[in-house]
From Swiss-Prot:
Gene3D superfamilies: Nucleic acid-binding proteins (2.40.50.140), Recombination protein O, C-terminal domain (1.20.1440.120). It comes from Bacillus velezensis (strain DSM 23117 / BGSC 10A6 / LMG 26770 / FZB42). This is DNA repair protein RecO. SUPFAM superfamilies: ArfGap/RecO-like zinc finger, Nucleic acid-binding proteins. PANTHER family: DNA REPAIR PROTEIN RECO (PTHR33991:SF1). It holds the Pfam family RecO_N.
Amino acid sequence: MLTKCEGIVLRTNDYGETNKIVTLLTREHGKIGVMARGARKSASRLSAVSQPFLYGSFLMQRTSGLGTLQQGEMILSMRTIREDLFLTAYAAFIAELTDKGTEEKKPNPYLFELILESFKRLNDGTDPDVITFIVQMKMLGVMGLYPELNHCVHCKSGEGTFHFSIRDNGFICHRCFEKDPYRVPMSPQTARLLRLFYYFDIGRLGSVSLKQETKNEIKRVIDLYYEEYSGLYLKSKRFLDQMESMKNLLDENKS
């Protein structure tokens, strides 16, 4: 059956000498894989529309297994991302997290809009750390993970100083600190931002400027939580961490 839909290219894998298997995130059908015959040839009409992170309109032959991509039309190329090594690292991480954190053929229009908006924001110059934090927090619910971010996991108080208890799955207040000696310290601002990123509509995001210290705290909480609960190993995460270390080193040398 021929189907036309909009999609985001999450991943491509070479298949044979001339073909690609393209993994698309679509609004109507969720995550699907399609064979793009001849897409490895530079002159192929499918080559341009099977680039990572591209947002396009696709005509495909759908089957119960791997579909076949017939044609495509670019809507947004996300060219700025692909031409910047640092932005590519962030986008590749978001794409792999989306790919490995979702099941095939399970439509989720909310997730589609989240990933599309995150790539648009990366392409337009929004702080990539902030975009990545938002996607990571919102992907938790997609994967069935629901940390308690509104009050203390023990006494249920919504007031006080909060740290994060990885073991107990959420915020822990100063009155209950002794119940988890391995809790992760964080500032009140970090606690507010974790909650904000979890609930906030990324489409409403304005200009955000975070201190590196705050970013480091957020990153530590999210990384530890994913390590404990997600069950995911993402190759792109290691690459992104290496790129961030390189960027921080370059920034230090400039100053």
